[in-house]
Amino acid sequence: MFRHVIATISVAALTPIATALGACDASEHRQFDFWLGQWNVRTPDGKLAGTNSISSEYGGCVLHERYSTGRDYSGESLNMFDATRKVWHQTWVDTSGALLLLEGGLSGHSMVLEGQTVGADGQATKHRITWTPNVDGSVRQHWESTDSKGQWRTAFDGMYTKQ
């Protein structure tokens, strides 16, 4: 009897570890992998906006973004698929003190994440960022935000090419 209890406790104790080992193996966790790599980011006129490094971390559960303009601005994001809610999440922080929380998922072949910030004046701004993989291996990032009248405007349009 005692051995049976010990065996049951041992199996129960190992179950979370076994579950955690395969926690991010589902195909949904790979939906944003097209963004992985070392990138040069250019504006539509071809000027270098910055560089971006996207790595897979924490056993493939997290995409870690490190963006730099090479000047006074840089930022990082953590991206993950929340399997419980079936949604992608991004937390962005940068040298301007900004915090941007986005959520969404695949729309066709593009990753579309949306969120909202509130300015010091209490004005809410909606954000929508779309990453679209291209057949040549590049990725377009189109960031839109709403103006004071609620109209969508392009905040950033960048083309990612592998370094």
Language model region names:
Residues 1-4:
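Positively charged n-region of N-terminal signal peptides that target proteins for export
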Residues 7-16:
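Bacterial N-terminal signal peptides
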Residues 20-163:
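Hydrophobic small-molecule pocket/channel-lining residues, especially in calycin-type beta-barrels
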